[in-house]
Amino acid sequence: MQTLPSSETVLLGSNSAPPVLRSPGGDDVDIDFGDVFGGPPKRRSKVTSNEVTRHSFSESALRRRDVIVDVGDLLPQDEKPVFGEDTSSVRRRFTTDDFFDDIFRVNESSSLPGSRILSPAHKPESSSGTSSPSQFSLPAKATEIPTFNLAATRSLNKNKETVSSSPLSRTSSKADVVSTAKSYSDDCDDPPQVFVTGKGRQFHFSIYKWPNKGVPVVIWGSSRLSSMSKAEETTPVPLSDYRKTSVVEKLGKNEEGDGKSGLSGLKDVKKTSLKRPGVQTKEEKTETDLKSEQAFFGVSKAREANVKPLDSVESEQAFSGVSKAHEATTVKPLHSIFHEEDERQDEKIVSEREVRKGKSKAKNTRSFTEDSRTKKKSQGTKSSLDSSPIPDKSSFASSSAAPEVGKDGVKGKVSDFVKIFSKGASVGAGGESLGQSSRWRAKETPKTDIIHDGSNAKETVNIPDQQKKSTPDIPAMNRDQKPSQSTQKKDSDRESMNYKAPGDTVQEERQEPSTTHTTSEDIDEPFHVNFDVEDITQDENKMEEANKDAEEIKNIDAKIRKWSSGKSGNIRSLLSTLQYILWSGSGWKPVPLMDMIEGNAVRKSYQRALLILHPDKLQQKGASANQKYMAEKVFELLQEAWDHFNTLGPV
């Protein structure tokens, strides 16, 4: 046994035994690590105290010296067999030189990588079979673990018993772990160098990557700063943030008095930013924008306050361009929307007018428009649109503003609309234009004779009647304040009807009386159809019977009043004279007044009268309605008298 000072590091060769660190009291180890995979640990009988030697992070373990101990000292002598083994004859051992070869050099995946990750050396065949616990009780400073001499020869013969022979133990999770490792490729024969430090939180290791493909084990030296810098390199920076940072850096350089120009300074910023893979493509795309900004800063050398107007100018230009494009595109759809709404409203109004107006009125309007148009053609006068003021200014406000828009071809439609609706109001006698005062002028000149130059004879036109029809039409349409296509179509149809031959008008005049005659017949038809012929004799008989019943009821009421007069409330007198009021065959036997002196006799007579006058009894006997009515009235009188008799008490 050899003891080394704590300042020295322990360097073990590939053929030496694995390093085992324990306290000087080696016989007092209280855990049998040879039985890690066989069940719960077994305590030795020689354990005296639960020292802290089993934990590698205790302060005492860090202070005491590192000791190289023989593996055989830790082997239990009275170990029980695990899974039926005999520990005396069968020993667990490192069988071949390439025991750890499958972890560090072989391409195929290792069987249990977790149990062989920190295997320290190739253990040659020895008498001590079981592996010792690897308690890495290392000092706080880094200690170099022996380099592994890996043989070039490989063997596929693996002992299945060595699966549980890993130097890892239950306490290895608390030990110091590998922090950095030198990567090597498959072609290189140099073994990897593994270093151990006391910072377990920096451990990053994967045996599936670096033994085969030569990928270096990424283990950062300084925990948070290095990780933040690494993550910052991989994360892409937005383009707007990059512009802001580059502008601020350039302004700082200009203020400090750097001799560099704006162009060169921003090129340096771009070079440094090209290291980031996420930003590279975005910066290449916006190279022209950066050059424009560079030229601006190179000329003005302004500060951060002067940079902001550039962004605002760009935003204003962009906004103005968008607003212009919006104006150019939205003029037509907005106007079309108004047209659609007006078309709907005008269709409703026109349909109502057509229903209200008769065919004779439509005939008069057609004749008047035809006469006015022929008069215009003969005299060659100007249109009413050019010479006359608009009848209602508020109605045609939109139409006057519409020609300014004129790009969409609305000007012609509006002018046609105004022409159509201003004919009746603006054209007066002799083709003169009339304004809003045309109504009053029409009153002053009630009638005018219009002489045609054609073959037609003179025709007298009643202008007040026509203007009464035409002038109300214009304000009705003024409410809409928008031209419509439906009204134009209908007016064009009217104009086409005006140009028909005179023979056609005569035929229409002949047809009108026939239509009026047919409508009158249609009105008369339902009058005859809706009536049914019924026999009224039965109803007359019923009425006669009802009248007879009413007379009989009156007679009964008079008879009852006469009988009850002076006897109301006197039960004895009513019962003694009951045979005078009841009909014959009622079943009432007269009772003399002398027999009803006592109270019991009165009670018996009253009960007999109730049996005769009760409605159920009358129903059984088949009494008539008049008899039932009489019995009801008599019963009411007897009931009142009986109540009065009970209040008086016995006599």
UniProtKB/Swiss-Prot annotation:
Record field: transmembrane: none
Recorded GO cellular component terms are: cytoplasm; mitochondrion
The UniProt regions of compositional bias labelled Basic and acidic residues, in chain numbering, are 250-259, 281-291, 337-357, 405-416, 441-456, 488-497
Q: In which tissues is it expressed?
A: Expressed in leaves and stems, but not in roots.
| Annotated positions of the Phosphoserine modification | 56
Q: Which InterPro entries match?
A: DnaJ_domain, J_dom_sf
Query: Disulfide connectivity?
Result: none
Comp. bias (Polar residues): 1-17
- Domain J residue range list: 586-651
What does the UniProt keyword field contain? Coiled coil, Cytoplasm, Phosphoprotein
Known role: Required for chloroplast photorelocation movement; chloroplast accumulation upon low blue light and for chloroplast movement to the bottom of cells in darkness, by modulating chloroplast actin (Cp-actin) filaments distribution, appearance and disappearance. May mediate a slight resistance to aluminum in root hair cells.
Q: Which PANTHER family match?
A: AUXILIN/CYCLIN G-ASSOCIATED KINASE-RELATED, J DOMAIN-CONTAINING PROTEIN REQUIRED FOR CHLOROPLAST ACCUMULATION RESPONSE 1
Protein name listed in UniProt? J domain-containing protein required for chloroplast accumulation response 1
Q: Which organism was this protein described from?
A: Arabidopsis thaliana (Mouse-ear cress)
